[in-house]
């Protein structure tokens, strides 16, 4: 009986113990589940409106070595488009800025601008109507590369059109932003145009952010830019504008270095001396730098006409900066993942170079500009490569817009050095930063580069070693993944090349007439050598499906307007098709313009003058028939392969 009682007690203890274990496990399980549910709830609160997680920490240029993973997104409360969810294309966006946000618009100043009237106000074109002033107008034009007489008639405080995207007009930015030094460099700049650049910045920049304006006179020869400029600055901007004068011309790069050395702002903004900023240009430009000081930014560049000072929009869709293997600056479309919201900053491999912002400390940590780069040329590549390869990032900012005068024809100013300083600059950049890819630059022009001394590169190589910068292969594959497709390192064969002879007028061939870009193409007596004629008649239907001068990637045939008799311009090559798309139809011998196949190149002789136009394609019109010196039939068989 006693044994039975002990057995029952042990059994009860086991049952109780089992129950305790079950209860404990249940309790622990419940706690774990509740904790996970709580974490899930917290995570849900950190998703943006599109269901994508917010990345709280941002490391500049900390890009995964494969492009498969999406870039870290951040919540944009002002987004104007529906960014696709994770099962679709993921957009690149910066992290959510921390801190109070503010509307930086100066609405009173904007309203005052709206009420202005007069010559050139609101960016309206101005014409000189008085025939007695035409000669003076011509002289101003030749001296400046733009219409200086019109510039003198326009107020230095003129109003501009608001060219921003609608989303930019209501967006708020961090209330706490770094202050800036704006650095203008100039050489023999038109006085009123320089003043308008200064006033433009002062009038449209929050005064609490504008620490300083630096004017660097790079050895100007004109008297008006000496004591009269000093007096004007002292009278109107005594505590804001600093003038630095180089005793002799150092060029763009040396002048910028001189300006950077006296800059006291937390961020430096470098500008050419013939610009006008748009409304609220600064906050969107420097907010990315406030988020991460290793980001450099560029505004969207609008245009001020060199002919009539009209102010109009540039590329509204934006473009990424790049280069070809002749080291010519090129532009490419924005990457699809960066173009989902056209109002947000996007990545660009190379800056245009004339307008950009950079944290002052970061600029000097990168070694500034290579001070052995002479005059101009290559500086935008050197700085862009350094920014990306040494831990930074370069962004273009659509909500920040600055208009620039792109000079027209003017009297040549001469080579200040008497040698090819641009090629030497390019070789310095290639030797330090481009690694094995430099050979593709040299092979494009071995005569220039083979025996060219790049100078002492010790300091620049030391910068790269000190900062432990990435390889150029990393840059080409991660930052500029489409460059090798758009600009093959090994020059591909042409679809057709040589002379382009008009069938109706066989003594005439397409000719640049000794002119360059922004001029109409013409016809002249055909060269004797059909496949390798003199440069002015050496054309190619290139791999980019454009008609360009062989060996001169800066000149392509471009048609701006529709028929009849549309002018065929020689224009800077952009390698993007569109107005520069051409196809050679071997059966009809037509050079067809555009992908819609409706316009053809036409040559004719009128009153003894040979002309070239684009007209609607017509069967049986021999004036629209052309013969190349050489046709690559194998390549033409696949001309449309790969086109969308």
Swiss-Prot record:
Gene3D superfamilies documented for this protein: 2.80.10.50, Spore Coat Polysaccharide Biosynthesis Protein SpsA, Chain A
According to the UniProt topology, which residue ranges lie Lumenal? 35-644
Q: What happens when the gene is disrupted?
A: RNAi-mediated knockdown in the whole body or the digestive system and reproductive tract is lethal. RNAi-mediated knockdown in hemocytes, epiderm, endoderm, mesoderm, respiratory system or nervous system causes no defect.
Q: Where is this region: Catalytic subdomain B?
A: 345-407
The question of whether Thylakoid is a record keyword is answered with: no
Cystine connections: 509-526, 556-573, 600-617
Gene name, per UniProt, is Pgant4
What is this protein identified as?
N-acetylgalactosaminyltransferase 4
GO terms for MF: carbohydrate binding; metal ion binding; polypeptide N-acetylgalactosaminyltransferase activity
Positions of the region Catalytic subdomain A?
177-288
